[in-house]
Amino acid sequence: MITALTALLVLISLALVVTVPVALATPGEWESSKDQFNKAFQLWVGLVVAIATADGISSSI
């Protein structure tokens, strides 16, 4: 489970690393898609918390 969550985190991180600079460099793109990026950032933070929680639970068992 932790491996799958980590793989998903890596894929989302890669997508954000590629798309955020492009959106910031394109005139008007950031304003139109800011909400989508905010949701992706929230998902990323949620995954970090989920991975930390899953790792803490699995290491205490």
UniProtKB/Swiss-Prot annotation:
Assembly and oligomerization: PSII is composed of 1 copy each of membrane proteins PsbA, PsbB, PsbC, PsbD, PsbE, PsbF, PsbH, PsbI, PsbJ, PsbK, PsbL, PsbM, PsbT, PsbX, PsbY, PsbZ, Psb30/Ycf12, at least 3 peripheral proteins of the oxygen-evolving complex and a large number of cofactors. It forms dimeric complexes.
Membrane disposition: Multi-pass membrane protein
Transmembrane segments: 5-25, 38-58
InterPro entries with a match to the protein in the record: PSII_PsbZ, PSII_PsbZ_sf
SUPFAM superfamilies named among the record's database cross-references: PsbZ-like
Name of a matching Pfam family: Ycf9
Compartments, record wording: Plastid, Chloroplast thylakoid membrane
Family to which this protein belongs: Belongs to the PsbZ family.
Keyword terms, alphabetized: Chloroplast, Membrane, Photosynthesis, Photosystem II, Plastid, Reaction center, Thylakoid, Transmembrane, Transmembrane helix
UniProt name for this protein: Photosystem II reaction center protein Z
Function: May control the interaction of photosystem II (PSII) cores with the light-harvesting antenna, regulates electron flow through the 2 photosystem reaction centers. PSII is a light-driven water plastoquinone oxidoreductase, using light energy to abstract electrons from H(2)O, generating a proton gradient subsequently used for ATP formation.
BP-aspect Gene Ontology terms: photosynthesis; photosystem II stabilization
Top-level lineage group: Eukaryota
One GO cellular component, as annotated: photosystem II reaction center
